[in-house]
Each structure stands twice: as C-alpha cells, then as structure tokens.
C-alpha cells in the first residue's frame, strides 16, 4: 500500500453530521497525522469514526508520547478514553510478549467498554488486549495470561489479585493509566492502588484522567507522579449541549410524571437513575407494566446478567435503562439523548456524572430531575458547586434542545430504527406495537384474545382495502395524559403510592435478561407457601425477612 492511496482503501463508517458544541470543537486545528502515529494506528482511528482530535486529545497525546506524567481534567464525553488509549497503542511493541500497559477503571462495565475501544482502535496494530474484572472466573484469567497480552484493562481488586499471585508480571510495565482517577483514589480503592504501584518499576509513566479532582488526587500526585503535566479544560463543569430541568413532584406522583415524559419526549434512548437497588428493580417493573421496553442494572446483579444488559442496551435492543450509580462513570452510549433522575442525587459529583451520560462528544442532550420538596436544598447546593442553573421544566420542551434537526444525520450505529417510535413492550417474539396481537407461528392464531366484531362490520372490513398500521397509528388521537396501554390490552389504573417491592414479583414482569426464575425458597409460588408447625413459624419468618412484607 503506497503513501498516497492508503486512506482510499479504509472502511470508513457513515459520517456523523449532528451539530456539536464548543466542548469538542474548540481545538487548535491539529489532525491525528500531526502526532506522528503509526499508519496502522491511524487506520484504526479513522475507521472508528474519528476525524479530528478533541481539545483534550490535542493537549494530552503529544505529552504522553513524549514520556511525561499527565494529570488531565476534562468534561465527560469529550474524548478522554481515546486520549490515553492512542498513546498506549503507539508505545506498545507487539513483538514483545509482556504486559506493557495497565489501564485501571472503577467498574466492570467501564472495563468492558475500554477494552472494546482498545480493540477497535488497535485492530491493525497487532496488539493483544485482555480485560479482567471481579465477578468472573479467576481460573480463566490465569489461563488467558499464558498467551501474549500487551494491554491489560481491569478493575483494581482483580488486578491486585493477579499481581500478588505473580500471574501477571508488572515489573517491566512502562505505562500505568487510571481512568476516573477521582473515584480510583477514593477510600474504596486508594489502598489497592498503592499496593498495585509497588509492582511497577520506579521509572514507569503514569496517566491520570478524570472530570473532577478532589484533594486526594493532589496528595497522590505529589507522592507518585514526577513533574506531571497538568491539563485543565474545565472552564465550566457541565456540558454545554445538555439542557437541565427540574420538576417538583410528590413521591406518589413520580411514576405518573415519568409516564407523561415518555409520551411527550422524543426519546432515542434514555437512562433513568435511582438512589437504591430496590427502587431500581421496582421502577423497572412499573415501567414495564406501563408498556415500555425497559431493562435494569445494579451492582447486586450477577455479573453475567450485568454484561448482557450492558451489551444489549449499547446495541439498541431496548430503549430505556433503569440503573443505580453503577453506570454513572465513563459509560459512552451515543444514542442516549435523555437522562432522568427519578431520585435526585445528594452530591454535585454524582449529579455531574449522571447527566454526562447524555450529550456525548459535544452532541445535544436532556437532563430532567424529578424532585421532592425535601430535595430543594440539594438542588441549591449542586447549583452553587457546579456553577450552573437548573431551570423549572416548561409545559413543552423544544425538541431542538436534545434532538438533531435532521434524523438522517445520526449514523446507523447510533440510530434505534428497529424499535417502535411509540409505546412498546417486550414480547417473547420481539417488539410489537400496542393493540397488535403477537402471532403464534405454530397455531397461526394471536396470543391475545380479541372480541369478534358484528357480521356487518366483518363484511365492511372484508370489502375495504387493508390499511398499514403506521397510518392507523397516526389517525388515532394522542391525549396529553394518556396512559400507555397495558400488555393485556387494558389501561393500567392511576399510579398508587411508590412502595417497596414485595417478596414475589408479578408474573408478567420478566426482569433483567437473562430473565431470572423465582428464588428457590419461593419455588412453590404462585400459591400458598407450605404450612409449618406452629412452633417453627416464627423461626422461619426470622430466617426469611422477605416474607415480612
């Protein structure tokens, strides 16, 4: 391949022509070719859809290639991940069969996402990347480390375990990278990070990236970094493309308000945050009962289920995701344009990372906060700390604030064309519009029982030409506060008090994929539990707190 035509043979993705903000456009006019990168690395960068470096990439990549320690601070969704992955891929030597770069991240989902970016950008370089996290088989990680691994991505606990067992050798690893450094240096991880650094050589290079840097980062920098190059692109903390609104809602009316938002907003994909795992599962159940496709994810779920939820949501197989603060950091899903705080966060840091899941890489996004009257103090505190204004929600929200003017401008990977645009739910055989029965392929009949119309209407229907379903959908009126139809064809009752979940979930709620079965202790449900002798009932109730509800 000659020097002139190598770009012509690239498999470039569709160009993203959505409008972008100054967060990623305020650059010095450099290109990736100005960094003297390998041609194989440039091929992976361009084929991944990158056109020009963002401000944080312009500042950090040259200094990282020069061997300097870096302490970089930039907004969420401005390209921090590529800022440290590109130098790693450039400095790694594929012919040297040893770990040459360690990337530490706080969550398992972020580790999976980071490893995927490494493989995407470095697919022509020839480097081998491995991801290791807690909740997975340690034996499998040990077996995989017998093969060549150049870049290791993982969470601190598992990496420390592998290093302490001398399964992975970090004594000659020249690169140490921490993403979300403020979280990594909190009390939860700081001791583990200190132990991991003891396995590194004294002349290793350290790259630290985050959106917020507390005092703990300053003390770590003074101890472990050598004349670090500090980058601070935070002229303001919040992204310029995100519109922020709040609404004071009583607790028992929050679900009704959420249903109204679903019917009014043009949502491509949305993330809904709750403050506890119990409320995450309960809210996902309520949203499913309203007729909307929904998954949920939190830290107490099995790792296999968390991975399945994360990948299917990234692929656009579901429109809404209810989660705890597990997915507040680093998760980059370009199709998400709406973030809803069903429970208002207590700290400015949590709020900043939550709303940063929308408006990725300078695009438009919308953040809506459902607040109780007691949250007004937290609202004032967050506004003061972030230096931003959260406005009261208007009667109608202008679509130009969070939706691209031209729908065709959104690249195919970021479009959810396979999902219905209105109210939908998940059936065993795929997505179906409300009112359309799910056809049974074996019997040829519908799974929903429909009433037969009178003979005169049947004759009129047989003589009239068939109409397409989208035209019928447009002819139906759309009242302002109309509920989403229930999967059984009926409308749900007015939302009741938002209470804690019972021991047994409703049978129509499938939960997160893979859909779990009833717990073993409730194997007899539905029905009555086995009767115990009177002397053992009190002891059994104490052993199973779930039956106290």
UniProtKB/Swiss-Prot annotation:
Q: Which reaction equation describes what this protein catalyses?
A: ATP + H2O = ADP + phosphate + H(+)
Q: What class of enzyme is it?
A: hydrolase
Say which domain of life the source belongs to: Eukaryota
UniProt motif DEAD box: location:
179-182
Q: What residue stretches are annotated with the Helicase C-terminal domain?
A: 241-401
Q: Where in the cell is it found?
A: Cytoplasm, P-body
> Which stretches make up the Helicase ATP-binding domain?
61-231
The GO terms describing molecular function are: ATP binding; ATP hydrolysis activity; chromatin binding; mRNA binding; RNA helicase activity
Keyword rRNA processing listed: no
Alphabetical list of InterPro entries matching this protein: DEAD/DEAH_box_helicase_dom, Helicase_ATP-bd, Helicase_C-like, P-loop_NTPase, RNA-helicase_DEAD-box_CS, RNA_helicase_DEAD_Q_motif
Give the start-end ranges of region Disordered. Answer: 1-24, 414-549
| A UniProt-annotated Pfam family | DEAD
Q: What is its EC number?
A: 3.6.4.13
- Residue ranges annotated as compositionally biased, kind Polar residues, are 1-11
Cellular-component GO terms for this entry: cytoplasmic side of membrane; cytoplasmic stress granule; P-body
Instruction: Give me the stretches of Low complexity compositional bias.
Output: 445-482, 496-512, 533-549
Keywords linked to the UniProt accession:
ATP-binding, Cytoplasm, Helicase, Hydrolase, mRNA processing, mRNA transport, Nucleotide-binding, RNA-binding, Translation regulation, Transport
Q: Where does ATP bind?
A: 74-81
Family as reported in the entry's similarity comment:
Belongs to the DEAD box helicase family. DDX6/DHH1 subfamily.
The written remark on domains in the entry is:
The Q motif is unique to and characteristic of the DEAD box family of RNA helicases and controls ATP binding and hydrolysis.
What does this protein's UniProt record list under function?
ATP-dependent RNA helicase involved in mRNA turnover, and more specifically in mRNA decapping. Is involved in G1/S DNA-damage checkpoint recovery, probably through the regulation of the translational status of a subset of mRNAs. May also have a role in translation and mRNA nuclear export.
Q: What is this protein called?
A: ATP-dependent RNA helicase DHH1
Species this protein is from: Candida albicans (strain SC5314 / ATCC MYA-2876) (Yeast)
Cite the source lineage: Eukaryota, Fungi, Dikarya, Ascomycota, Saccharomycotina
């Amino acid at each position: 391949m000659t020097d002139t035509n190598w770009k012509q043979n690239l498999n470039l993705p569709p160009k993203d022509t959505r409008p972008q903000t100054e967060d990623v456009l305020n650059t010095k006019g450099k290109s990736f070719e100005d960094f003297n990168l390998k041609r194989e690395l440039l091929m992976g960068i361009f084929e991944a859809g990158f056109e020009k470096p963002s401000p944080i990439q312009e500042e950090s990549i040259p200094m990282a290639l020069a061997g300097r320690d870096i302490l970089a601070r930039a907004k969420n969704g401005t390209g921090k991940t590529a800022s440290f992955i590109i130098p790693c891929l450039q400095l790694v030597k594929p012919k040297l069969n040893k770990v040459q770069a360690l990337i530490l991240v706080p969550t398992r989902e972020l580790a999976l996402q980071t490893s995927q970016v490494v493989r995407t950008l470095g697919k022509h370089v020839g480097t081998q990347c491995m991801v290791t996290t807690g909740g997975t088989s340690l034996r499998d990680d040990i077996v995989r480390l017998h093969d060549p691994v150049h870049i290791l991505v993982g969470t601190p606990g598992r990496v420390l375990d592998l290093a302490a067992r001398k399964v992975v050798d970090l004594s000659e690893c020249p690169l140490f990278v921490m993403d979300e450094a403020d979280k990594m240096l909190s009390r939860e991880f700081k001791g583990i990070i200190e132990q991991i650094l003891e396995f590194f050589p004294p002349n290793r290079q350290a790259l630290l990236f985050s959106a917020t840097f507390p005092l703990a980062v300053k003390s770590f920098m003074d101890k472990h970094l050598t004349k670090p190059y500090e980058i601070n692109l935070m002229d303001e903390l919040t992204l310029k493309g995100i519109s922020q609104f709040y609404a004071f809602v009583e607790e028992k009316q929050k679900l009704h308000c959420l249903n109204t938002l679903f019917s009014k907003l043009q949502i491509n994909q949305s993330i809904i945050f709750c403050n506890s795992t119990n409320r995450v599962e309960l809210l996902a159940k309520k949203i499913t009962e309203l007729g909307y496709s929904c998954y949920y994810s939190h830290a107490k779920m099995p790792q296999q289920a968390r991975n399945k939820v994360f990948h299917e949501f990234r692929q656009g197989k579901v429109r809404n995701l209810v989660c705890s603060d597990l997915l507040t950091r680093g998760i980059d899903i370009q199709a998400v344009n709406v973030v809803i705080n069903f429970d208002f966060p207590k700290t400015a840091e949590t709020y900043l990372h939550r709303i940063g899941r929308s408006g990725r890489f300078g695009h438009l996004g919308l953040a809506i906060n459902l607040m109780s009257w007691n949250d007004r103090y937290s609202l004032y505190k967050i506004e003061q700390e972030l230096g931003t204004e959260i406005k009261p929600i208007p009667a109608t929200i202008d679509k130009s604030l969070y939706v691209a003017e031209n729908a065709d401008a959104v690249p195919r990977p970021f479009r959810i064309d396979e999902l219905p645009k209105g109210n939908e739910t998940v059936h065993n055989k795929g997505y179906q519009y409300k009112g359309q029965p799910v056809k049974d392929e074996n019997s040829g009949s519908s799974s929903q029982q429909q009433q037969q119309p009178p003979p005169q209407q049947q004759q009129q229907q047989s003589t009239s030409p068939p109409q397409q379903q989208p035209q019928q959908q447009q002819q139906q009126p759309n009242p302002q506060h109309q509920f989403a139809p229930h999967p059984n064809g009926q409308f749900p009752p007015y939302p009741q008090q938002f209470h804690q979940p019972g021991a047994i979930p409703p049978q129509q709620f499938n939960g997160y994929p893979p859909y779990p079965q009833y717990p073993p202790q409730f194997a007899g449900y539905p029905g009555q539990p086995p009767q115990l002798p009177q002397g053992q009932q009190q002891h059994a109730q104490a052993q199973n707190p779930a039956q106290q509800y």
